[in-house]
Amino acid sequence: MLRLAYAPVWIAASVLLVVTVLYLSLAPLNIPAELPTHFDKVEHAAAYVFLVIWFTGLVARPRYWRVVAALVVFGLTIEILQAAMPFGRQGDPWDVLANITGIGVGLAIASVATGGWALKVEAWLNRS
């Protein structure tokens, strides 16, 4: 983790974020009928773009590979859990592909624009 003055806050927010994604991924599903087919793939990709941007904001660039590895394992674990669930959820290899696509897009964005964002936020907070 970067040397962050508000590290406990960033860690707590990170735990909350991961728990929220886990809950939303495993909770019983209520999809409105008007959503397009396979719209959930867009949701998967967007969620993982956000997760990568979040976590690459908290670690040094040489550690980005750890973020990628952890999120791939997280996504695979969720799909395995969904496949084992007896109600309303099922594992889907296309969801895994959407997750990995989101991870790639998020990594590209972090590499050129948003990496280390937490340091910038803390610098801004300390100016106030």
Model segments located where?
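Bulky hydrophobic segments
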Residues: 1-94, 100, 104-128
